[in-house]
């Protein structure tokens, strides 16, 4: 909210991930995730900000969205349903149009790659490692990825280190 005056337009989208299941992994329903509360809450709190849009883009399902950024299609996923590069082509098929980039969060660290001609941008976690990461010995520092986009796609990206929560 405090940054919105510095931008012409602020768009917020999110997908559900594997950290907010209400029941165990085996019994959880895809549509029963606490992530949905974030978008609902932000919509209510930000309704008076004319340049802030919550839920921008086209939602394929609760785990996938598509947004147009300066004429390029970006697909957002958490990543827990898409564990290998082979799934990139499946995502493009689901969208039904050429995809420029896939935005992913699942693995708790920043990374970029090009898979089957599609750029992949993986953003880290605000908190770094959680209990699951510790148990599986997956390392991740608190970090995020910022992409600067133009009509050609991603012009540059920045790794943003965050302060760990004590």
Where do the model's predicted regions map?
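Conserved beta-sheet core of the metallophosphoesterase superfamily
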Residues: 31-63, 69-165
